[in-house]
């Protein structure tokens, strides 16, 4: 026996739909025609669309375009969708029409059928709510779908990624403060350089992430300008007066975010520059996180035959063949996430440039990568903080050993004896296996007392403190 089916109709004709499905004919056609990959439209985008449907219904009701019962039914169905309990009824692939029309209709159809269930009507009857005439009233996919991407990404940034990023920054700040007394050897070109404080090295990571958070916050502000009310091309055809302002005000009231209609609806519908900019800032953050992860795993390499300056928590066995091996797995996971996000940015940039005239037809791709990129970075930052940074320690003895053996401390002698003599001392020490002090004394270029005054790693690490 096959799956029970019901038949629904749209402007093309009849189509068989699973009997228990809350979606309708247009969603089913998309499932039939676009069986491509496994990437689905993100739930955050579906929930944002449902929220927008609620706001549009409320404004349409105030303008007399929907009655109180219709508004209430859309309100309740939209709320049910936002709980996530209906997520299985949004099965569409990212790889569909470039406008997102089929996902917009998926939401309209599910709301229609939820209302039918509540009202004792048959699924697919379009009673008491028609997907187009009532639920999509005063709307076009061309304005509500990109608006939903804006809303979903803005709320994700505000509620998830930025707070987690702040916690990560605070964790690094605690390490920077705790390790201010540790003097270590700096490294440039992966070679020994002059000393610095371990706390200062960590503070560089912290402040680079703080800059990233600042620019993400700026991008978040750009996302608050919505294309809602532009309908098909930006003119607002088939909307009541001030619809754009009233819908955005309704959305702002419900979310606590200052959503506004964009100054030029034609511009934000023809192009998605704010979304491209936000993705670019995610890439910037990914670049910073990737360099931090790489720095940490380099400083932690060992434990016996590497730098070993940082000690990482042993979260899990590292090898199926080498007993006792522990790997920097959180750094590796972070590096993979960041590499993925950098690739996502390239896709979004190309998609943003791919629009023609009044419409960009890469909307699902842009929305998917942006929302997924935010989610990946938020999850990676949380895991990195909890499973690596919290338990990361400094090997003070190993760090001090490297400082004592470093030849680059000779840099402090340069103002006193000149570059060439200082270079000769360092080369002599390295060639003959001497300490820097021994080579300096043999050179006769500086006295023992003056050497001790100049070669002070703590003073070299903080020359102006």
Swiss-Prot record:
Task: Tell me which InterPro entries the record gives.
Answer: Fum_hydII, Fumarase/histidase_N, Fumarase_C_C, Fumarate_lyase_CS, Fumarate_lyase_fam, Fumarate_lyase_N, L-Aspartase-like
Please report which protein family the annotation says this sequence is part of. Answer: Belongs to the class-II fumarase/aspartase family. Fumarase subfamily.
The EC class name is lyase
Q: What else does UniProt say about it?
A: There are 2 substrate-binding sites: the catalytic A site, and the non-catalytic B site that may play a role in the transfer of substrate or product between the active site and the solvent. Alternatively, the B site may bind allosteric effectors.
Q: Which GO terms describe its biological process?
A: fumarate metabolic process; malate metabolic process; tricarboxylic acid cycle
Write the protein's name: Fumarate hydratase class II
* Quaternary assembly: Homotetramer.
Q: Which amino acid positions bind substrate, per UniProt? A: 99-101, 127, 130-133, 140-142, 188, 320, 325-327
Keywords assigned by UniProt?
A: Cytoplasm, Lyase, Tricarboxylic acid cycle
What's its EC?
A: 4.2.1.2
The annotated site for Important for catalytic activity falls at 332
Q: Which transformation does this protein catalyse, written as a reaction?
A: (S)-malate = fumarate + H2O
Location within or outside the cell: Cytoplasm
Q: Can you name the source organism? A: Parasynechococcus marenigrum (strain WH8102)
Name the residues annotated as catalytic in the UniProt entry.
189, 319
Name the domain of life: Bacteria
GO molecular function (one) = fumarate hydratase activity
- Tell me one Pfam family matched here: FumaraseC_C
Q: Which pathway does it take part in?
A: Carbohydrate metabolism; tricarboxylic acid cycle; (S)-malate from fumarate: step 1/1
| Protein task | Involved in the TCA cycle. Catalyzes the stereospecific interconversion of fumarate to L-malate.
